[in-house]
C-alpha cells in the first residue's frame, strides 16, 4: 500500500514538471507583455501631468508648504517625543535601580525581621523562664528572710548569752586571780615564817649570820669581767638545768643573775644563778595560764612579767609578789607574742590574724588591727616614735606599724615566713629570722635590708624559733635545729662561733638570751633543758 502511494505522488510530480516546461515560453511572453503595458501607462500619465502642470502648480505649492509645515511639526513632535522617550528611559532606569535597591533592602530587612522574630521568640522563652525562676527565687527569698530574721533573733540571744558568759568568765578569772594571790600570799607568809625561824636559829652563830647577811645583800666581790661593757663570746657550759615538764619555749634575763623561762607546762619559772655560776635555783613560779606559754616580756624596772599563751590570752604578773595582775582575753586563737607597749599598754599578736592594743588599767582592748596573716612575733620600743611597733607574719612579711593608724605604714617581704623579731638597743635596727634559714638586719628608718646572715649548717628549728642581738648589739645569734647556736658579727656578717648545747641533734634550740653584763648565754630547747654558756 505504501509503494502505491509513493508511485502515485511521483506520477503527479512528473506531470507537473512536464507541464511547467511546456508553458514556460507562454509565461515569459505574458510577463513581457505586462512590462510593456506598465511602461505605456506610465508614458500616458507623464503626458497628462505635463498638460495639467500649469493648472495645478499653484495648488501643489500650497499643498507642499502645508506638507512641509506638517513635516516640521512632525519633526518637532518627533524630537519632543524622542526627548520624552530619553527622559522616560532615564527615569525608568532610575526607577529600576531604586527598585533594585529597595528590593535588596527589602530582602535584607526581611532576613533581619526573620532573625528578630526568632530572637524575640527565644527572648520570650527566656523571659518566661526568668519569670518562673524569679518566682521561685522570690519564694526562696521570702523563706530566707524569715530564716534570717529567726537567726538574727537567735544571734542576738546568743550574743547576750555570750556577754553574760564573758562577764561570768571575767568574774571567775578575777576570783581565780584572788585565790591565786591569796595562795601566793600564804606561801609568802610561810616563807617569811621559815625565814624568821632561820634567823632565830642563826642568832646563835654571829659569824654564820654575817655570811648569810652578806649573801642576802649581794656584797660578795665579783670579778671585773662581770662589768665589762662589751660582749664576750661564750666558751664553756656552766650548767644545764631542767626547767619545765615539757618544751621550753622562751627564756629572758631579768637581771644579771635572775632569769625567767616559759614552757609548754603552762608555767613561767623564775630562777636565780648561784654566785659561782655553776647552778641555778628556782625563786618562784608564775601560774595561771591554761595552755603552753609562748613568749615573755618585762618592764624596764623588772617588776612585772608579761606572758602570751596558747589559751588565747595574755597575763601580767607582779614578779616580786608573784600576783596575777591582769588577764587580757579577746583573741580567738593562740597568742604568739605580746609586748609591753608605751607606758600603760600591751600589744599582742595572734594566730587569728589580728593584733590587739590593750589598756592595762582597764583591761580592755583599745584597738584591733586586721592583718590578714598569722602573727608570729611582735617587738616594740622601735624607731624614734613611742607609738611604733613591728610584727612578723606567715606571709613572709615584716610589717611596720603606728598605733594611731589602722593599717601598716610599711612592709618588707623576706624569702620565707618570718618566725621572730628582735630590736637593737637604740631601736633603729630589727633582726628578723625567717624559715629560709637566714637572718635579716633591717633598718627601721628606711626599711632597707642592711645585712643577711646564714651558714651552711644553720637550719631554723620551727615557726617560733627566736634570734636575738647580744647585749651591746655586737653580735647576732640564733639557735639551730641541730642543737647548735650560731653567732655572727653584726657589722661584718662573719660567723664568729658555733656552740653546741647538746650531744643529740634532737634538742632543737627554741630561744636565746644574752646576759645584760655581756657575759653569759642562755639557750632553751625542746628537751626541757636550759643551758648557760660563759
Swiss-Prot record:
Q: Which terms in the GO cellular component ontology are assigned?
A: Atg12-Atg5-Atg16 complex; autophagosome membrane; cytoplasm; phagophore assembly site membrane; plasma membrane
What is the annotated localization of this protein? Cytoplasm; Cell membrane
A Pfam short name: WD40
Q: Which cysteines are joined by disulfide bonds?
A: none
One Gene Ontology molecular-function label: protein-membrane adaptor activity
GO biological process terms held by the UniProt record = aggrephagy; autophagosome assembly; autophagy; defense response to Gram-positive bacterium; germ cell proliferation; germ-line stem cell division; macroautophagy
Q: In which tissues is it expressed?
A: Expressed in neurons, pharyngeal muscles, body wall muscle cells and intestinal cells.
WD repeats (start-end): 243-281, 288-329, 330-368, 371-411, 413-452, 459-498, 504-534
Q: Is this entry keyworded Zinc?
A: no
Question: Which Gene3D superfamilies does UniProt cross-reference here?
Answer: YVTN repeat-like/Quinoprotein amine dehydrogenase
Keyword terms: Autophagy, Cell membrane, Cytoplasm, Membrane, Repeat, WD repeat
| Family (UniProt) | Belongs to the WD repeat tipD family.
What does this protein's UniProt record list under function?
Most likely a component of the atg-5-atg-12-atg-16.1/atg-16.2 complex, which is recruited to the preautophagosomal membrane and associates with lgg-2 to promote autophagosome formation. Plays a role in the recruitment of lipidated lgg-1 probably to the autophagosome membrane to promote autophagosome formation. Furthermore, association with atg-5 is required for the nucleation of lgg-1 positive autophagosomes. Although its role in autophagosome formation may be distinct to the role of atg-16.2, it functions in a partially redundant manner with atg-16.1 to regulate autophagic processes.
Query: Could you give the subunit structure recorded for this chain?
Result: Homodimer (via N-terminus). Most likely a component of a complex at least containing atg-5, lgg-3, atg-16.1 and/or atg-16.2. Interacts (via N-terminus) with atg-16.1 (via N-terminus). Interacts (via N-terminus) with atg-5. Interacts (via WD 5-6 repeats) with lgg-2; the interaction is direct.
What is the protein named?
Answer: Autophagic-related protein 16.2
The taxonomic lineage of its organism, from the top, reads: Eukaryota, Metazoa, Ecdysozoa, Nematoda, Chromadorea
In the UniProt record, what gene is named as encoding this protein?
Answer: atg-16.2
Amino acid at each position: 500500500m505504501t509503494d502505491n502511494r509513493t508511485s502515485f505522488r511521483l506520477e503527479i510530480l512528473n506531470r507537473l514538471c512536464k507541464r511547467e516546461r511546456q508553458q514556460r515560453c507562454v509565461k515569459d511572453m505574458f510577463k513581457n507583455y505586462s512590462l510593456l503595458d506598465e511602461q505605456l501607462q506610465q508614458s500616458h500619465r507623464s503626458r497628462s501631468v505635463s498638460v495639467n502642470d500649469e493648472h495645478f502648480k499653484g495648488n501643489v505649492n500650497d499643498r507642499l508648504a502645508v506638507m512641509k509645515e506638517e513635516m516640521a511639526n512632525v519633526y518637532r513632535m518627533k524630537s519632543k517625543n524622542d526627548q520624552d522617550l530619553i527622559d522616560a528611559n532615564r527615569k525608568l532606569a532610575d526607577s529600576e535601580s531604586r527598585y533594585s535597591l529597595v528590593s535588596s533592602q527589602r530582602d535584607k530587612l526581611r532576613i533581619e525581621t526573620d532573625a528578630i522574630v526568632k530572637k524575640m521568640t527565644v527572648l520570650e522563652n527566656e523571659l518566661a523562664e526568668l519569670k518562673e525562676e524569679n518566682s521561685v527565687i522570690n519564694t526562696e527569698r521570702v523563706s530566707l528572710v524569715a530564716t534570717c530574721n529567726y537567726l538574727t533573733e537567735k544571734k542576738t540571744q546568743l550574743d547576750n548569752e555570750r556577754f553574760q558568759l564573758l562577764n561570768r568568765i571575767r568574774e571567775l578569772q578575777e576570783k581565780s586571780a584572788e585565790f591565786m594571790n591569796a595562795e601566793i600570799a600564804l606561801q609568802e607568809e610561810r616563807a617569811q615564817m621559815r625565814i624568821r625561824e632561820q634567823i632565830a636559829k642563826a642568832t646563835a652563830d654571829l659569824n654564820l649570820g654575817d655570811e648569810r647577811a652578806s649573801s642576802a645583800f649581794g656584797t660578795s666581790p665579783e670579778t671585773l669581767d662581770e662589768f665589762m661593757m662589751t660582749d664576750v663570746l661564750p666558751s664553756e657550759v656552766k650548767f644545764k638545768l631542767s626547767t619545765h615538764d615539757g618544751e621550753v619555749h622562751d627564756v629572758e634575763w631579768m637581771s644579771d643573775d635572775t632569769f625567767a623561762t616559759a614552757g609548754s607546762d603552762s608555767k613561767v619559772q623564775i630562777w636565780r644563778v648561784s654566785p659561782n655560776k655553776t647552778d641555778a635555783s628556782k625563786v618562784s613560779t608564775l601560774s595561771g595560764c591554761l595552755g603552753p606559754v609562748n613568749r615573755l616580756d618585762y618592764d624596764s624596772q623588772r617588776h612585772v612579767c608579761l606572758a602570751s599563751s596558747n589559751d588565747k590570752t595574755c597575763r601580767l604578773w607582779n614578779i616580786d609578789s608573784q600576783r596575777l595582775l591582769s588577764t587580757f582575753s579577746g583573741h580567738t586563737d593562740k597568742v604568739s607574742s605580746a609586748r609591753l607597749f608605751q607606758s600603760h599598754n600591751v600589744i599582742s599578736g595572734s594566730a587569728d590574724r589580728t593584733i590587739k592594743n590593750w589598756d592595762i588599767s582597764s583591761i580592755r582592748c583599745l584597738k584591733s588591727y586586721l592583718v590578714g596573716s598569722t602573727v608570729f612575733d611582735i617587738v616594740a620600743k622601735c624607731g624614734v616614735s613611742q607609738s611604733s611597733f613591728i610584727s612578723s607574719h606567715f606571709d613572709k612579711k615584716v610589717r611596720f606599724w603606728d598605733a594611731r593608724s589602722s593599717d601598716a605604714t610599711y612592709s618588707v617581704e623576706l624569702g620565707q615566713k618570718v618566725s621572730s623579731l628582735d630590736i637593737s638597743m637604740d631601736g633603729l635596727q630589727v633582726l628578723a629570722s625567717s624559715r629560709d634559714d637566714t637572718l635579716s638586719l633591717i633598718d627601721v628608718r628606711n626599711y632597707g635590708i642592711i645585712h643577711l646572715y646564714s651558714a651552711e649548717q644553720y637550719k631554723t628549728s620551727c615557726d617560733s624559733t627566736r634570734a636575738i642581738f647580744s647585749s651591746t648589739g655586737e653580735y647576732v645569734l640564733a639557735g639551730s635545729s641541730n642543737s647548735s647556736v650560731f653567732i655572727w658579727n653584726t657589722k661584718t656578717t662573719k660567723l664568729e662561733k658555733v656552740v653546741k648545747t647538746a650531744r643529740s641533734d634532737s634538742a632543737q634550740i627554741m630561744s636565746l638570751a644574752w646576759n645584760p653584763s655581756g657575759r653569759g648565754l642562755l639557750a632553751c630547747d625542746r628537751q626541757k633543758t636550759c643551758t648557760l654558756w660563759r
